[in-house]
């Protein structure tokens, strides 16, 4: 297909309000995205919404692509039936990323659903703790920052402070407390850094 027609062709079937670049998946490398139209390289600072943390065409991935192809051909229900590939995966994740004080992992496919499952765990833990302390069935509110994005699935819509309210205006949401984010603005100066320090509760003695 002609590169000039790709965006129009996709636009026949879905909303195309994304970036203008047409990614060349074969030539992109490391943290650099290559535009298929002109070969220009862009430093990918969002790594495809954090779905490509090792970058494009990582040497290890290319060397072991047969393993990845085999896994991509089939999508088993990993919560119900197991495979050698799954055993390798959970063993590696357990060794590399799982701390000893958290013996069990719960894998979720996608950021919004990962946030939702973290919320469920927090609700369950907090309410049980309050019940045990005689405080009643409390602990079902989530404090969160303004101008944040955690997804647009069920619970996460109540956390996402969308820059375009039309996207969620008719969806029911929980009235959870939303607070200012202690962000910094460039250029950095003594005052902006002091604001961050103060918001974290750190008190720096005057000279």
Task: State where each predicted segment sits.
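Short, compositionally biased leader-like segments
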Residues: 1-18
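Generic alpha-helical secondary structure signal
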Residues: 4-8, 59-63, 84-87, 191-194, ...
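Glycine-rich loop-to-alpha-helix module at the N-terminal edge of alpha/beta enzyme cores
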Residues: 12-14, 22, 41-133
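Short, P/G- and charge-enriched loop/turn segments at secondary-structure junctions
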Residues: 17-21, 165
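Short loop/turn motifs at secondary-structure junctions and domain boundaries
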Residues: 20-29
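Short, acidic, Ser/Thr-enriched surface-loop or helix-capping motifs
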Residues: 35-37
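PLP-dependent aspartate aminotransferase-fold enzymes
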Residues: 91-207
């Amino acid at each position: 297909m002609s590169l000039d027609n790709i965006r129009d062709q996709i636009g026949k079937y879905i909303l195309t309000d994304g970036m203008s670049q047409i990614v060349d998946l074969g030539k992109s490398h490391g943290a650099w995205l290559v535009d298929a139209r002109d070969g220009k390289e862009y430093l990918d600072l969002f790594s495809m919404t954090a779905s490509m943390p090792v970058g494009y065409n990582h040497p290890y991935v290319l060397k072991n692509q047969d393993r990845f192809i085999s896994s991509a051909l089939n999508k088993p229900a990993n919560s119900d039936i197991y495979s050698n590939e799954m055993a390798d995966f959970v063993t590696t994740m357990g060794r590399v990323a799982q701390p000893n004080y958290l013996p069990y992992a719960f894998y979720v496919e996608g950021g919004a659903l990962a946030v939702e499952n973290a919320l469920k765990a927090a609700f369950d833990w907090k309410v049980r703790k309050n019940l045990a302390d005689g405080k009643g069935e409390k602990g079902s509110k989530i404090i969160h920052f303004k101008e944040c994005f955690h997804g647009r699935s069920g619970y996460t819509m109540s956390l996402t402070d969308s820059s375009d309210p039309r996207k969620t205006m008719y969806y029911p949401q929980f009235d959870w407390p939303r607070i200012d984010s202690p962000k910094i603005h460039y250029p950095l100066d003594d005052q902006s850094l002091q604001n961050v320090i103060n918001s974290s509760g750190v008190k720096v003695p005057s000279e």
